Amino acid sequence: MNDKIVRATAKNGMVRIIGGITTNLVNEGSKIHECTPVAAAALGRMLTAGTLMGTTLKGEKESLTLKINGGGEAKGITITAHNDASVKGFIGNPYVTRELNDKGKLDVGGAIGKDGLLYVIKDLGLKEPYVGQVPIYSGEIAEDFAYYFTVSEQTPSAVSLGVLVDKDLSIKAAGGFIVQMMPDADELLADLVTYRLEEIPPITTLISEGKTIEEILEFIFEGMDLNILDSIEPSYKCDCSREKVEKALASIGKKDLQEIYDDGKNEEIVCNFCNTKYSFTTNDIGELLKNSIKK
């Protein structure tokens, strides 16, 4: 089944929904970073949140960065997303291992930790990016984003993010949704939506059963005039290039470049997001140095 993100409304626009299946995307990210099961679950939840939230951006030059670091052994996760539902990310320690939590589930909250902040950074092409931050609520990620939306954006929200890791470490199912109540929605509607969300099986169970994201949302919002607005296929996509790496290397300054050149060793730079290796010979460093001196 292909991954898909849909945007929808229910109850005449009183409920706003973004939902998606992200199994292939999360599998790609987990493979790139060679994640353990708990690392794959943590990274996958963040990637899913990123691709869902990225679709709310208006322009293709806008970007969204999500960061969470609670002092746990995962050593933080960073995600960057765009409005075409493309996303990339990295986890500080992809080899983190934890015992299962008291519910018999992967202990994402323990791996992330609670002693830190969740950051949401929106670069909308203005002079300064918008930066929202909240204390980490549980480290389970979905609850942390629900807390962020409610506290920082004053939008009561329910967030579900799930990743099911198979025995061979591939991703069996991944997906999630963000459900937000509009300001004019009445409390009875909010209570009904909350009740429905509490009663449904985990989203990974529904995906594993072969349900599409449309079928999942129709199941949740049955009798509530669900209206699917649009859909898009998400992807794990890194936009790194040798040219960008050269610019980053040149930006460290002439003094540091000169030291690297004087060492006479080849330099290798690895992209955090996709692990692509970029090699620079002494001659390459010399050219960068020469160009920086000209400037």
From Swiss-Prot:
The set of disulfide-linked cysteines is 238-240, 271-274
PTM comment, free text: Under oxidizing conditions two disulfide bonds are formed involving the reactive cysteines. Under reducing conditions zinc is bound to the reactive cysteines and the protein is inactive.
Q: Where does this one sit in the cell?
A: Cytoplasm
Q: Say yes or no: keyword Chaperone present.
A: yes
Q: Which GO terms describe its molecular function?
A: protein folding chaperone; unfolded protein binding
Which SUPFAM superfamilies has this protein been placed in? Hsp33 domain, HSP33 redox switch-like
Could you tell me the superkingdom of the organism this chain comes from?
Bacteria
Q: Which Pfam families match?
A: HSP33
Per the annotation, which location comes first and is thus the protein's main one? cytoplasm
Identify the Gene3D superfamilies for this entry.
Answer: Hsp33 domain (3.55.30.10), HSP33 redox switch-like (3.90.1280.10)
Keywords, A to Z, come to: Chaperone, Cytoplasm, Disulfide bond, Redox-active center, Zinc
The terms describing its cellular component in GO are: cytoplasm
Gene Ontology biological process: protein refolding
What does the UniProt record say this protein does? Redox regulated molecular chaperone. Protects both thermally unfolding and oxidatively damaged proteins from irreversible aggregation. Plays an important role in the bacterial defense system toward oxidative stress.
Give the PANTHER family listed for this entry. Answer: 33 KDA CHAPERONIN
Query: Family, per the entry?
Result: Belongs to the HSP33 family.
Entry protein name: 33 kDa chaperonin
Organism, scientific name: Clostridium botulinum (strain Alaska E43 / Type E3)
Organism ancestry? Bacteria, Bacillati, Bacillota, Clostridia, Eubacteriales
